[in-house]
């Protein structure tokens, strides 16, 4: 599949195609094709053999067949989503949850990021119960397992943007309830990576509907205001990039506007001293913009700059 040999020859395209076709055929005993058996038997292989098997899996999954460039292994996985579930739930093989097989979990992680490249397979995963288990996997205390799960989580939510937006809108409450809980209670690395991903998702135009629902929530804004006061500077910094979306929203609810108005002076003072040692021109400009927006938010009964009464007052 990869060429090599004594002469370090390049891969033979015909042999690659033949291997992809042969491994896509169902077995005679009705137990599935080579793809299925490889997924199911992976934890039982020796370490180096397991790595080779995963490399072969990734290669045959992406190898096109014929003039129409069909992907038989993608089609097979699409028709057998239980195999995708096995791959997603592989973090449970790790030492904290079941069998103490961290290496197998990490190998499955490379396979998960490979299948995420294909929209049909990614759809199965994003709408599955197994996907929500990834919040638990990202909070494992074993750093390698948690980081690998976070890398796969990010790939699933950013590879196919329209699909991800559909999944987030459909599963909004169950997704963000878990996401916010992770931001409050997760470990430092998970919280920092998750905040960074959240700001990226909210600012992506594909997720405009998701963004408007998220920033309409008082609870979400209060969470970001609390994270702005976190002990870790990097958490504060990432929270800032989410909080700015609430402040910049021209269609704030009366409740959100009221909270910002009541905390206006404290927020302006906080921003004035917020990480001024950062040599980041864009960050400085965004801080200045937020400060101007907050200063223009007159409290109820006061007049905003320009002589107009603040929103929500009569």
Question: Which sequence ranges carry the predicted segments?
Answer:
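Elongated alpha-helical scaffolds that mediate protein-protein interactions in large eukaryotic proteins
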Residues: 1-107, 114-131, 138, 146-147, ...
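Phenylalanine-focused residue identity feature
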Residues: 2, 46-47, 57, 127, ...
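Structural signature of alpha-helical solenoid repeat scaffolds
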Residues: 57-59, 109, 113-114, 153-155, ...
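Helix-loop junctions that connect tandem helical modules in alpha-solenoid scaffolds
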Residues: 37-48, 83-103, 133-144, 177-189, ...
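Structured C-terminal portions of repeat-based eukaryotic scaffold domains
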Residues: 176-290, 294-314
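Active-site cradle of extracellular carbohydrate-active enzymes
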Residues: 141-142, 147-188, 192
């Amino acid at each position: 599949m990869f060429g090599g040999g004594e002469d370090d020859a390049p891969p033979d395209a015909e042999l690659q195609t033949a291997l992809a076709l042969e491994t896509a055929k169902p077995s005679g005993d009705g137990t599935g094709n080579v793809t299925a058996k490889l997924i199911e038997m992976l934890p039982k292989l020796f370490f180096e053999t397991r790595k080779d098997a995963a490399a072969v899996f990734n290669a045959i999954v992406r190898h096109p067949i014929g003039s129409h460039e069909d992907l038989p292994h993608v089609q097979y996985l699409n028709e057998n989503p239980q195999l995708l579930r096995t791959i997603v739930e592989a973090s449970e093989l790790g030492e904290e949850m079941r069998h103490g097989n961290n290496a197998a979990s990490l190998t499955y992680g490379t396979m998960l990021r490979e299948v995420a490249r294909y929209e049909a397979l990614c759809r199965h995963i994003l709408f599955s119960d197994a996907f929500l288990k990834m919040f638990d996997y990202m909070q494992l205390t074993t750093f390698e397992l948690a980081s690998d799960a976070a890398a796969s989580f990010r790939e699933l939510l950013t590879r196919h943007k329209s699909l991800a937006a559909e999944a987030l809108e459909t599963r909004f409450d169950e997704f963000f309830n878990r996401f916010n809980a992770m931001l409050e209670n997760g470990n430092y690395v998970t919280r920092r990576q998750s905040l960074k991903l959240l700001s990226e998702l909210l600012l992506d135009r594909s997720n405009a509907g998701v963004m408007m629902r998220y920033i309409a929530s008082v609870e979400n804004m209060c969470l970001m205001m609390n994270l702005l006061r976190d002990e870790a500077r990097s958490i504060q910094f990432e929270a800032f990039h989410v909080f700015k979306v609430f402040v910049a929203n021209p269609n704030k609810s009366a409740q959100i506007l009221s909270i910002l108005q009541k905390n206006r002076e404290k927020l302006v003072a906080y921003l004035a001293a917020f990480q001024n040692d950062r040599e980041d021109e864009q960050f400085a400009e965004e801080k200045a913009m937020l400060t101007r927006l907050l200063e223009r938010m007159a409290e109820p009964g006061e007049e905003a700059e320009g002589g107009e009464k603040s929103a929500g007052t009569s």
